[in-house]
């Protein structure tokens, strides 16, 4: 069991202002009557906490790796990309399978070009897969697809007239 003096000191150190009793009459006169006006004490160990995302805007400079990664991500794709078309299932075969396209173009341009080469009607469907794995969105950049999924410096686009993969 705790002694009365230790109980009083723990009450005086309590964060709850209702439990805290003034140690002297003079202290009670010096305190403001409203505890809400009291200033919040500074936190000495707050500097050890990791930065939050909202605090990261305060940084004056980025680490070199992060700066380079952001510069690479913001770079506009320039130059040409080699695209190799591979037919799947019963899709017609192109005479020439390798073409070059500007890296700044959207994947929609690749699909429209392929439809034109295959002499497709407006009602015919052409489904394109990158590396026979996934069908990219039409608004994906060709340069970004090439950077991420190239094989032997070519973007491999498999195509089919019907869905080939589940």
From Swiss-Prot:
Q: Specify the cross-link site (Glycyl lysine isopeptide (Gly-Lys) (interchain with K-261 in ATG5)).
A: 166
| A GO molecular function held by the record | protein tag activity
Give any Gene Ontology cellular component: autophagosome membrane
Q: Which GO terms describe its biological process?
A: autophagosome assembly; autophagosome maturation; autophagy of mitochondrion; glycophagy; piecemeal microautophagy of the nucleus; protein transport
Q: Which domain of life is it from?
A: Eukaryota
Localization, UniProt? Preautophagosomal structure membrane
Under the heading CDD domains, the entry gives: Ubl_ATG12
Q: What is its main location?
A: membrane
Q: How does it sit in the membrane?
A: Peripheral membrane protein
Key words, A-Z: Autophagy, Isopeptide bond, Membrane, Protein transport, Transport, Ubl conjugation pathway
What Pfam families does the record point to?
A: APG12
In which residue ranges is the amino acid composition biased (Low complexity)? 1-18
**Region described as Disordered:** 1-47
Q: Which InterPro entries match?
A: Atg12, Ubiquitin-like_domsf
Q: How does it assemble?
A: Forms a conjugate with atg5.
Question: So what does this one do?
Answer: Ubiquitin-like protein involved in cytoplasm to vacuole transport (Cvt), autophagy vesicles formation, mitophagy, and nucleophagy. Conjugation with atg5 through a ubiquitin-like conjugating system involving also atg7 as an E1-like activating enzyme and atg10 as an E2-like conjugating enzyme, is essential for its function. The atg12-atg5 conjugate functions as an E3-like enzyme which is required for lipidation of atg8 and atg8 association to the vesicle membranes.
What protein family is recorded? Belongs to the ATG12 family.
Q: What is this protein called?
A: Ubiquitin-like protein ATG12
| Organism of origin | Emericella nidulans (strain FGSC A4 / ATCC 38163 / CBS 112.46 / NRRL 194 / M139) (Aspergillus nidulans)
């Amino acid at each position: 069991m705790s002694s009365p003096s230790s109980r009083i000191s723990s009450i005086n150190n309590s964060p709850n202002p209702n439990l805290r009793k003034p140690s002297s009459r003079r202290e009670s006169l010096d305190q403001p009557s409203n505890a809400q006006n009291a200033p919040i004490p500074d936190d000495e160990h707050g500097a050890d906490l990791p930065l939050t995302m909202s605090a990261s805007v305060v940084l004056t400079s980025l680490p070199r790796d992060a700066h380079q990664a952001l510069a690479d991500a913001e770079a506009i794709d320039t130059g040409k990309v080699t695209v190799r078309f591979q037919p799947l299932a019963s899709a017609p075969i192109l005479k020439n399978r390798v073409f070059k396209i500007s890296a700044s173009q959207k994947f929609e341009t690749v699909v429209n070009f392929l439809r034109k080469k295959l002499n497709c009607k407006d009602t015919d469907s052409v489904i394109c897969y990158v590396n026979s794995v996934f069908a990219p969105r039409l608004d994906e950049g060709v340069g970004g697809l090439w950077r991420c999924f190239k094989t032997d410096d070519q973007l491999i686009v498999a195509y089919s007239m019907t869905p080939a993969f589940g």
